[in-house]
Amino acid sequence: MLKLKLTFLLFLVAAMPAWASYLLIPMDETQRNHLKAYGIAYYALQREVEVTWLLNYRGGSFMMKYADALERESRLRGVTVEVIADGQSTAILSEIADASVNMDAVRLQKAPKIAVYSPKTKLPWDDAVTLVMTYAEIPYDVVYDEEVMAGVLPTYDWLHLHHEDFTGQYGKFWGNYRNAQWYIEDVRDQEARAHKLGFSKVSQLKLAVCHKIRDFVMGGGFLFAMCSAPDSYDVALAAENVDICDVMFDGDPMQPNAQELLDFSKCFAFKDFRISTNPAEYEISTIDIDDRSRMKTINEKNDFFTLFEFSAKWDWVPTMLTQNHTRIIHGFMGQTTAFRRNTIKSSALVLAENKELGEVRYLHGEYGKGTWTFLGGHDPEDYRHFVGDPPTDLSLYPNSPGYRLILNNILFPAAKKEKHKT
């Protein structure tokens, strides 16, 4: 690794033309591959090259010191780059610094260490985050219950949760898939893992994992969750010491008054929701706006949500999380597709919504020293991803606005913002 860094520094010093001081990676409509552009930013950070994220400038562009190796790698990956002189970079920063424009520059200084919470066994659906990180060539580690309970989370900066059920109800797939081989094997594996780690029920293990994740965020970690993970995580926290699992999930009936015993103060984002007590219903709670309700008024052709616009100079965190080359994003479904506004705590910040339908799609908040971000839906380029569908081929969607939201979150932990003078 030291040899790699020294070699790269030699490139940085020796291969920099006097007239070409910076590389600009535009993130507007001129960019050929938005997704791999994030990978180039990460690639530079890995080699200790500082990256400046130009918020709201040409779609949230990246700028860094010129190196022949960086330009060559960018072009090799199909990423559009512009070689600019020192004077041009100064002019860009001057334009951004103007108090009358809604732009800002944020320094990215260190490549975040990334963990994805996912079982080692193969389940019949894809994970949008691992798909896009693999496509963008951003490295990550896979961790699951054994590693989390062993205490590895504090060694990471960023943790992703996707299609996971932290309530111990196996994704509420019992109604449709209880006789499927993959479901039978998943239940068997989950139960064996719980017993191995000293728990009598899967729900007890998952709650312990939730507490480890909570402590990770409290200590300064960055949590990003999609699909069923956001609501199942908060439901599990609210249901601490409450049995919300019916007999087919844990061998005994749920508590008759389980709903009344929920403690919403333990949740990150949600409140006042009702849990689903029907074991055959493919829903965890009323946090999600269920598909049957949505499909009365919405379909693939008219399903969109809008990113909020924030003050880049003062609200730089939500501004980073909403960088895009369009403010209108095509919707996509999941076990949890959209969050009901009346179940969202006032402390949570809404990043995107479909106002007409009253749907919140993208949420952010703080917990302790860290932050969490929740995004509804399963796969931004597969409108209704079914069990058994093949993974999305991202080479067909190199400019996906929905996948850009995921990648914004991956670079977010690398940011260091200068304090404004008052």
What do the predicted segments below correspond to?
Residues 127, 134, 231, 261-385:
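Catalytic beta-strand/loop cores that center a nucleophilic Ser/Cys/Thr
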Residues 20-23, 28-32, 62-72, 122-230, ...:
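Helical hinge/lid and interdomain linker segments adjacent to catalytic or ligand-binding clefts
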Residues 97-102, 146-148, 357-361:
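Alpha-helical scaffolding within the catalytic cores
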Residues 183-184, 198-199, 206, 238-241, ...:
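Catalytic cores of eukaryotic secretory-pathway lumenal/extracellular enzymes that build
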